[in-house]
From Swiss-Prot:
This protein's UniProt keywords: Aminopeptidase, Cytoplasm, Hydrolase, Manganese, Metal-binding, Protease
Protein's recorded name: Probable cytosol aminopeptidase
One GO molecular-function entry: metalloaminopeptidase activity
Family: Belongs to the peptidase M17 family.
Transmembrane segments: none
Principal localisation: cytoplasm
InterPro entries, sorted: Leucine_aapep/pepB, Macro_dom-like, Peptidase_M17_C, Peptidase_M17_leu_NH2_pept, Peptidase_M17_N
Amino acid sequence: MDFAIQAGDLGKYYGDCIVAGVFESRKLTEAAKALDEMCRGYLTKVLDQGDMDGRANTTLLLHNVPAIGSKRVLLVGLGKEEEYVEKVFLEAIRAAFKALHQTGVKDVGLCVADLIVKGRDTAWSVLQSTLLVEESVYRFDRLKSKREERQPSLQKIIFLIGDEAARAGAEQAFKQGAAIACGMNVTKDLGNLAPNICTPTYLAEQAGEMAKTYNLKLSVLEEKDMEALGMGALLAVARGSHQPAKLIVLEYHGREGIEKPVVLVGKGVTFDTGGISLKPAVDLDEMKYDMGGAASVFGTLTAVAEMKLPINVTAIIPTTENMPGGNATKPGDVVTSLSGQTIEILNTDAEGRLILCDALTYAERYNPDVVIDIATLTGACVVALGHVVSGLMGTDEPLVQELLQAGEKASDRAWQLPLGEEYQELLKSNFADMANIGGRWGGAITAACFLSRFTRKYRWAHLDIAGTAWKSGKEKGATGRPVPLLTQFLIDRAQQH
């Protein structure tokens, strides 16, 4: 998809379709008013005939509008003006692109200048629109014998802004949006692949391709390397699978010198049966998404590399399957982690924290500025927060606040949960330094408490994306989250330094 900015007179746009908004009661936005004046009230006349009343997410496509340079005009309903908020804007843009894909348009002029939501600016509107158009053309059909015959015809979006002064910010926004969308597509593709294809070995191969494309430093630890180091927790999860586990490290050096890196640690369980603590059969196929944390780290690093951000980022991806078998870890087994701490494994389905704890300890050797782990860690987080926001906890409050603010900017929000010492009591074991589960209550918090025991040498935050990494049902598929949040966090950090 190509993007461009055009400022000034809407009459100078001569493309396939121009998109403008209409509020309820047929109230035209400023851009729609300008178009209406050009065509001498034609839009008002059509609306007065009852073809559209401006209700949210409705659309009206008009052809050959008099005195308009564009071949078509698409009017998009924005609902009540006093209720026009961010959610309405995003849904309106989705509705517009859905309608456009039913046509043969190749280029579109989007009037973003007067679609701005209170508290946002033109740059935000451009960035979000860029993400939404890329989302609208995303298809995952590589595993089908016959792909969809009709592919989206849309090739170019021209953002029509009223003020030339906003051009620089808008141009930067669509470039960032295109990079983030590229990263989200990487995350979606990895998540949507079948688990017999997307194995730990496949992820290591993809890391190799990525290292070549973006000139990254790559290292991969094999099981023998992990055993030599003493990664007993990660290897305990891998024991039931015929697929060898990997620990993948990708290093992006965007800033010269000795600046400490931001380390992103992504949980990469490419299929999670639960192990001996076997999961129910219902929706078990969705456990291919249990590598959503790893996929989001791949995607975020892609976005960073596409933008050539002046920042150092290290990605650490522990990856394995969690399978039952004669050699699988049993409930009650005690293992020694890389940190030297011992863990009683009471539930083999609490495996994500086991592979993460060794990866978090391994992160120490990179002398990190901060460490953020991303994981589809707990069903408890989904119970608490649903599928709208990601769970966020951490031992460093300024870091947590940075991530919360980045999520707000990116419209990819997280919500902070407590991480009090009182919860640590729930991880006590009679036979080891700790248990890998903390009982029925506060499961998302006790999982984070477990991880915190392996992060005492640096500033750390944890994103639980179990509710946001994928969708179920008719729209089943990976979402690409939290790539926007993480990328915005890194953009902000690069600008600060």
